[in-house]
Amino acid sequence: MDALAPQHRAAVQDILERLDFTFQIRTPPKQVRLATVEKLYDRPRLSAAMWRFCQFVPRFHTFELSDTAFTVDDLKGLHGTMTLIHKQPGYRIYIADGRVEKGRMNNPIAVGAKMVTAYHYWEGPHGLEGHLQTWTALDSALLGFLSRPFRSYIQRRQEEFIAYIFSNIAQGSEFAESHPQEFAEPIRREGDPVAIRQFEAAFGKNGKH
């Protein structure tokens, strides 16, 4: 907490004081360098384009709002904003402000929430490993009250979804490490100039630095 800017510290404290769910998971070792993962995390528009090429679902699209914030949207009722509030090599903290519309993940009511995500990742003897922790507060006391009958369901679905997302991120990062050139042509075909620029900055014009 001491490393955070005052406004971010206040936002984190607000979430912790209204806490509904906590979650943590370790990601198994993957054959990817920390430097490659940092490149991808620094370029969310590129990461989303690579995610789509890997045919992971949902098909996420991202739009960068600033150097530290971006939106995530699957265009089907799952959307949010991610704000990076602390960064150092191998460690990032985000505040996520998201919403899942009714029925999008078989949820019986629309769910809005704010979440603190702390992700620590490092190169171990068998590859890049990670430890993810999240703290989630539903958007309102009324929503918390209305969701009580479904609380265990909402928590379970959130945990399954986060584990799935980070497993796919790890797999995609591993593929980007070994075959970056495979992404070059599909990203050009999509035609997003930002993603193309970010790919060339990270991996070279044809994925061969």
Model-identified regions with their sequence ranges:
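Ordered hydrophobic segments in well-structured contexts
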Residues: 22-29, 39, 91-95, 114-118, ...
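"Short basic amphipathic alpha-helical interaction patches in structured regions
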Residues: 52-53, 108-113
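Hydrophobic ligand-binding cavity/cleft-lining segments
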Residues: 1-67
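Hydrophobic/aromatic beta-strand elements that line small-molecule binding cavities or substrate pockets
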Residues: 79-86, 112-123, 134
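Terminal "cap-and-tail" regions of soluble proteins that handle hydrophobic small molecules
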Residues: 1-5, 120-209
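Solvent-exposed loop and beta-edge segments used for protein-protein assembly and interaction
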Residues: 31, 88, 124-126
